Amino acid sequence: MLKEFKEFAMKGNVVDMAVGIIVGGAFGTIVNTLVSQVLMPPLGLLIGGVDFTNLYLILKEGSKAAAPYAALADATAAGAVTVNYGLFLNSVISFLIMAFAVFLLVKAINMLRREEKAPPLAPTTKECPYCLSIVPLKATRCSSCTSELGK
């Protein structure tokens, strides 16, 4: 059984998948940092200095302190029940950037993999000049109208 597992684990597809998962995880960290540290601060300034991570809706005030809360962390510490749509926006933007980056990567790989198209095959049929039926190239008579065909 150990031998079978080793054969399975060493197949090309399994190893490729494992490498893809590891690289994907590292790439996800890079994209998350790009979104949270590079893209979101200027975007927040454009919409009035809002930090998306602190965008939330209070469903129920906390028992430890009353609203308003300065930040999501304060609301959470006070025990408030919140809908954190700012964190959701960060996740959506992060996903879109990740998806676009993967699209560009796949597109680049596909451009490198393009194979030359095979030359078109020589024709194996021809058209009868009398009835316009398709007949084999080597035929001397049309099977539809029985006309003699020139070579």
Swiss-Prot record:
Cellular component GO terms, alphabetical: plasma membrane
One Gene Ontology term of the molecular function aspect: mechanosensitive monoatomic ion channel activity
Record's subcellular location: Cell inner membrane
Transmembrane segments: 14-34, 38-58, 86-106
Pfam families, sorted: MscL
Complexes and interactors: Homopentamer.
Protein name, entry field: Large-conductance mechanosensitive channel
Gene assigned in the entry: mscL
